[in-house]
Amino acid sequence: MKILVTGATGYIGSHLCKLLTEKQHAVTGWDIGLYGEANNVDNFTENLYDIDVTNFDSKHKFDAVVHLAGRVAVDESVRIPYEYYKTNIEGTANCLDNIETDHFLFAGTAASWDLASPYALSKVAAEDIIKQKAKGYTIFRFFNVSGTNTIHKQLGNGTHLIRMVAKVAAGKKDTLQIFGNDWNTKDGTCVRDFIHVVDLANAIITAIEKGPTNSPYECLGTQNGYTVLEVVKEMEKVTGKKIPIEFIGRREGDIESSIVPEVSSLLNITKTLSDMCLDQYNLERNT
């Protein structure tokens, strides 16, 4: 199949492009060059273009479009909400206006249930536009994605929890800062549902090959919730390293708990939290 991946040089996009290419799909990647010379997909696709999804008007046609491009940091969205509305809403609308496809696949978020941040609001608005305009669609709601199959260099300032814990374990940071210890959870720290990036990418490929679901959303998570402190303990267990922690104030836009309500039938879970912790630690230790 002829497939476009927006956000192709990002964390999820680079893994997805590699797996799609291994399955003999013809992959085209778009991104805006945020990763500079260290292109994470230059070995996996012949067609990589520096295209801003908010600012193109040329017409294109693909069998499927996987729209991963977007702004994704909850705390940043509170500071610069307009940029999130522009990229995540206008960028999605522009893709729908200018790309002809029978199947539009969208990277939504678990944050969409609580609407506690401009990031979440922008993703829900994009979902609504897709339902109105796409010929056929599959809307995913991603939970907390982690792990690696070693192809992704993870440049930039990624701040997801498992990566930050792994940085401390690998000696790149002295202390892990935890946002709040007064949440209404078993140990006072936030609860999150983690999914391995390879499991998630394979679920996207399954969706591409099966065709549009046209359902409200497909949840990609494991239904296993872990507190921040439980993740710290798991990292200590698999690495044998002590993780010094520091509790600081709650982060604006955060929610107490995020666990998938129902796992999509598109997802085959093969990786555990231990796998994600060890993957991330090995990556941080060797880069």
Give the residues covered by each predicted segment.
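N-terminal Rossmann-like NAD(P)+-binding domain of SDR-like oxidoreductases, especially those catalyzing
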Residues: 1-146
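Short-chain dehydrogenase/reductase
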Residues: 85, 89, 116-124, 154-163, ...
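C-terminal substrate-binding subdomain of Rossmann-fold SDR/epimerase-dehydratase oxidoreductases
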Residues: 167-287
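Alpha-helical scaffold segments in soluble metabolic enzymes
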Residues: 94, 164, 206
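Basic phosphate/pyrophosphate-binding loop/patch that engages nucleotide-derived ligands
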Residues: 132, 161-167
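Short aromatic-enriched loop/helix-cap "lid" or pocket-rim segments at secondary-structure transitions
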Residues: 39-42, 149-154, 190-191, 231, ...
